[in-house]
Swiss-Prot record:
This is Pre-protein VI. Residues 48-74, 233-239 are annotated as: Interaction with hexon protein. The modification Phosphoserine is found at S124. All late proteins expressed from the major late promoter are produced by alternative splicing and alternative polyadenylation of the same gene giving rise to non-overlapping ORFs. A leader sequence is present in the N-terminus of all these mRNAs and is recognized by the viral shutoff protein to provide expression although conventional translation via ribosome scanning from the cap has been shut off in the host cell. Keywords: Capsid protein, Cytoplasmic inwards viral transport, Disulfide bond, Host cytoplasm, Host nucleus, Host-virus interaction, Late protein, Microtubular inwards viral transport, Phosphoprotein, Ubl conjugation, Viral capsid assembly, Viral penetration into host cytoplasm, Viral penetration via lysis of host organellar membrane, Viral release from host cell, Virion, Virus entry into host cell. One of its GO terms (biological process) is viral life cycle. The keyword Nuclease does not apply. A motif (Nuclear localization signal) lies at residues 131-135, 245-248. It comes from Human adenovirus C serotype 5.
Length: 250
């Protein structure tokens, strides 16, 4: 298999591709340059030496000499030492006080925790000794519900089942007279099925043209494939609206 140069696929700036060798990563060839610790340290030393030079010049000048004499007269150095000593002693005293308070809090006995007394239920004297009055005798309540008579009882008594109408009222039958319903005989509801009559069947004879068309088979709608695929595509989708250009001279 042939070696493929993938650099040809990278974007180019003129004739130079952006994708170069990997050995350039981390060096000064990158955009912005590499970070150098040596240059940073040399810059710091240069700044320190410059400050030292200006300070020594100011200290050795006449103004610096007068300032030193004034500080000696006011005993400035002794005051600074006394202030530092007092500050350190104050911090030590505060630390000693905190430690002593911790020790005293641990040595002192803890005060006993007082438990709250249990709640006492109070009973009012008025409600004490009262009892529910006991009845002398038990009373039983009996309720009677008037229900309609059963079907057998209604037939035995010969009672009408509906409310009688005054103009259509008739005498009530006796107690032992049977009650019957005189119904007309059932009508013959079954009907004979009606059969349809014979219908004439029309026979049509195919024409000769239809027979020839059936013998020749279905026509093919697909165009004949040619050697050029563009002509085949044009025969499928069409060429659109045909336009005719004519030049006329007036």
């Amino acid at each position: 298999m042939e070696d493929i140069n993938f650099a040809s696929l990278a974007p180019r700036h003129g004739s130079r591709p952006f994708m170069g060798n990997w050995q350039d990563i981390g060096t000064s060839n990158m955009s912005g340059g590499a970070f150098s610790w040596g240059s940073l340290w040399s810059g710091i030393k240069n700044f320190g030496s410059t400050v030292k030079n200006y300070g020594s010049k100011a200290w050795n000048s006449s103004t610096g000499q007068m300032l030193r004499d004034k500080l000696k007269e006011q005993n400035f150095q002794q005051k600074v030492v006394d202030g530092l000593a007092s500050g350190i002693s104050g911090v030590v005293d505060l630390a000693n006080q905190a430690v002593q308070n911790k020790i005293n809090s641990k040595l002192d006995p803890r005060p006993p925790v007082e438990e709250p007394p249990p709640a006492v239920e109070t009973v009012s004297p008025e409600g004490r000794g009262e009892k529910r009055p006991r009845p002398d005798r038990e009373e039983t309540l009996v309720t009677q519900i008037d229900e309609p008579p059963s079907y057998e009882e209604a037939l035995k008594q010969g009672l009408p089942t509906t409310r009688p109408i005054a103009p259509m009222a008739t005498g009530v039958l006796g107690q032992h007279t049977p009650v019957t319903l005189d119904l007309p005989p059932p009508a013959d509801t079954q009907q004979k099925p009606v059969l349809p009559g014979p219908t004439a069947v029309v026979v049509t004879r195919p024409s000769r043209a239809s027979l020839r068309r059936a013998a020749s088979g279905p026509r093919s709608l697909r165009p004949v494939a040619s050697g050029n695929w563009q002509s085949t595509l044009n025969s499928i989708v069409g060429l659109g609206v045909q336009s005719l250009k004519r030049r006329r001279c007036f």
